[in-house]
């Protein structure tokens, strides 16, 4: 048995665009919300709408392994902020044109294989191609593994924003998406057949 079969590299993941309300997306979002309930005692209260993750306003991706096409093992999305979507309390923190990462998740059976970094790299690359200049995200102090990923990927802490801006334990990060400013994991993209 080859080690690449047992532990696929991030380069082996194939990303495809999916609707936020696609059944496979919903399965992952539900699993993520359950994770939040276990770690924080409740689901994420950040309001999201499926249309925020549809081009050109954003993007939602599912990642498949080559030996399991059509069966997602990870996901993530980003939504673009404009002046109308930035709450007055977040002015000066968020900028028009920022891409906000939301709903990043790797199936527990496929963790510790670099897939979270691959999802993050693909979200960065797609946001940059869509003209976003910066990527922002929020995590919490009960997710040290997420914080470690973002710091290792070159993200810098910024003041808290969003519904948790005034709560202790809200950790927010940003990274510029200037041309060539981040190393993306090599990824093969599956052809999009809608969805």
Language model region names:
Residues 113, 117, 121:
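Residues forming the Rossmann-fold NAD(P)(H) cofactor-binding site
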Residues 107-109, 113, 141:
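Active-site acidic-Proline motif in GNAT/NAT acetyltransferases
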């Amino acid at each position: 048995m080859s080690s690449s079969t047992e532990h696929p590299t991030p380069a082996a993941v194939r990303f495809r665009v999916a609707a936020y309300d696609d059944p496979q997306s919903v399965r992952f979002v539900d699993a993520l919300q359950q994770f939040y309930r276990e770690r924080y005692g409740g689901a994420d209260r950040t309001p999201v709408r499926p249309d925020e993750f549809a081009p050109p306003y954003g993007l939602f991706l599912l990642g498949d392994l080559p030996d399991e096409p059509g069966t997602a093992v990870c996901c993530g999305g980003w939504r673009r902020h404009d002046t109308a979507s930035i709450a007055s309390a977040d002015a000066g923190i968020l900028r028009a044109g920022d891409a906000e990462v939301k709903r990043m998740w790797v199936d527990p059976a496929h963790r510790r294989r670099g897939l979270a970094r691959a999802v993050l790299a693909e979200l960065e690359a797609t946001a940059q191609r869509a003209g976003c200049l910066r990527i922002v995200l929020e995590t919490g102090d009960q997710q040290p593994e997420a914080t470690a990923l973002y710091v290792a990927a070159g993200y810098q802490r910024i003041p808290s924003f969003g519904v948790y801006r005034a709560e202790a334990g809200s950790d927010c990060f940003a990274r510029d998406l200037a041309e060539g400013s981040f190393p993306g994991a090599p990824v093969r993209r599956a052809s999009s057949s809608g969805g």
